[in-house]
Amino acid sequence: IFVDRLTFYIDTILIGEVLEGTMAKIAVIGAGYVGLTTGACLASLGHDVVVADNDNDRVNSLKIGEIPFFEPGLKELVGKVVDSQRLSFVFGAANASKEAEFHFLCLPTPSNKDGSSDLSFLEEGINEISSVLNPNSIVVNKSTVPLGTAKKIQNSLGRNGAHVVSNPEFLREGE
């Protein structure tokens, strides 16, 4: 199943409506296609968004306005929300999550040779943010994962008082 950009944007707007009336502090973990577009859209709605990645070169490129992939209008949107100081980029998930109320996990889950999902990137992100989550934080998993993964995340993060929401992305890039 693929979701077009309009549906992705509407999905982000719906999340934004949940946050409407607030100036939420949001951490987006993962600066790939899903993470960067999610972060830029949420920042355009007025939220304070920090996008984190463990690739220091990617973070440095984003800080100077270099977008690592093509998506119509994204470069301009990122520039606008960075200039308005609503979007910033950091190295390391914990650095983004320290002050955040909402944490969007947008990490790759590539397929293993046997067809199962490699959850190592997701697990690494969860481990990084677990020590800095504020009580009652909302963790939104946008990574595409097998059934039962949300429960595992809740078991890992629930001891911190975090609540887990599953909102996976199925999309087609750059058309």
Question: What are these regions, as identified by a protein language model?
Answer:
Residues 19, 174-175:
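Short, intrinsically disordered, charge-balanced linker/junction segments flanking boundaries
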Residues 110-173:
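Rossmann-like NAD(P)(H) cofactor-binding subdomain of soluble oxidoreductases
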Residues 48, 54-102, 108-116:
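Conserved N-terminal Rossmann-fold NAD(P) cofactor-binding segment
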Residues 46, 84-86, 136, 161:
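A generic structural signal for alpha->beta connector loops
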Residues 1-22:
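Short, Lys/Arg-enriched N-terminal segments with co-localized hydrophobic residues
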Residues 23-66:
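NAD(P)+-binding Rossmann beta1-loop-alpha1 motif at the extreme N-terminus of oxidoreductases
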